[in-house]
Amino acid sequence: MRVADFSFELPDSLIARHPLAERHGSRLLVLDGPSGELAHKQFTDLLEYLRPGDLMVFNNTRVIPARLFGQKASGGKLEVLVERVLDSHRVLAHVRASKAPKEGAQILIDGGGEAEMVARHDTLFELRFSEEVLPLLERVGHMPLPPYIDRPDEGADRERYQTVYAERAGAVAAPTAGLHFDEALLEKIAAKGVERAFVTLHVGAGTFQPVRVDKIEDHTMHKEWLEVSQDVVDAVAACRARGGRVIAVGTTSVRSLESAARDGVLKAFSGDTDIFIFPGRPFHVVDCLVTNFHLPESTLLMLVSAFAGYPETMAAYAAAVEQGYRFFSYGDAMFITRNPAPRGPEDQA
């Protein structure tokens, strides 16, 4: 299976670089996986597709202001993007500088704060800060907007590049399907008899890394930390017992649930995952998916293709481009019902 099979043309004008005035103001492209039928809706129309007894699973990770600017004590400017918080004072981070800092180098953070480069782990740098990391990031850090947004972060991004139910700090990218939900919509969903549960997956910067191989099977996924609690396992079991559907809000919720059910049975799990879902891989838990539109040739587009079927997904994306949908993190959304017999690119005769 070739990465190039997942390419599509996207006009630059369709990349959403700012959020809409209202979270729920986005459009919603509904894809019925079994039939391939499309419906063009507003995000608030999602209520029409939910049933009493369904279970919606959200990712409650909280985006940290993970981007720092500063300089080495020796002089050169640099940019730090925290990838993972290791403990109260240490992080793994990407460092951009004209010359990479050496072990023992001191880093002076703009706005106040210092760090020492402790060790290098492949492309990541282990940094130890002179004070607690999370309060420092909240004070002087910048929201880590994705590269394709292509603008400096603004004050409003602290609120809008964050879900309203974000709770557990640790992500350096938002679980963007959740950005469409405001408190009023969540209340309407609950009033309809739809249950909710929360997993945690701390989204890493690796989610934006391009696939650098020609064949999908040769790709190695980045690792991210997740937790699926016993409460979630019990909620899924109760949903199944009453005939409801499990609806994942975002690909991170899909990856969390399917990581915890790799042997076919959902179990409580806490730890790293490198699960790579592409056409041909079965789904054990998720029945429906709320998701944004993803980058060409990305692992997330491959996940959606595995869920809905490759021809159905690519046809939906072509329709979205034609109809002027807004793409990526601050863009519009899809609601997808799983295709029970999805076809891959190799099935296109």
UniProtKB/Swiss-Prot annotation:
Annotated EC: 2.4.99.17
Gene3D superfamilies, sorted: QueA-like
Protein's cellular compartments: Cytoplasm
Reactions catalysed: 7-aminomethyl-7-carbaguanosine(34) in tRNA + S-adenosyl-L-methionine = epoxyqueuosine(34) in tRNA + adenine + L-methionine + 2 H(+)
GO annotation, biological process: queuosine biosynthetic process; tRNA wobble guanine modification
Disulfide bonds listed in the record: none
GO molecular function: S-adenosylmethionine:tRNA ribosyltransferase-isomerase activity
GO cellular component: cytoplasm
Major enzyme class: transferase
One Pfam family per UniProt: Queuosine_synth
Keywords, comma-separated and alphabetical: Cytoplasm, Queuosine biosynthesis, S-adenosyl-L-methionine, Transferase
UniProt KW Protein transport keyword: no
Record SUPFAM superfamilies: QueA-like
Keyword Nucleotidyltransferase assigned: no
Family matches, as InterPro entries: QueA, QueA_dom1, QueA_dom2, QueA_sf
Pathway the protein contributes to: tRNA modification; tRNA-queuosine biosynthesis
UniProt subunit comment: Monomer.
HAMAP family noted in UniProt: QueA
Membership in a protein family: Belongs to the QueA family.
Function text: Transfers and isomerizes the ribose moiety from AdoMet to the 7-aminomethyl group of 7-deazaguanine (preQ1-tRNA) to give epoxyqueuosine (oQ-tRNA).
UniProt xrefs under NCBIfam families: PRK00147.1, queA
Protein name from the UniProt record: S-adenosylmethionine:tRNA ribosyltransferase-isomerase
Source organism (scientific name): Pseudomonas entomophila (strain L48)
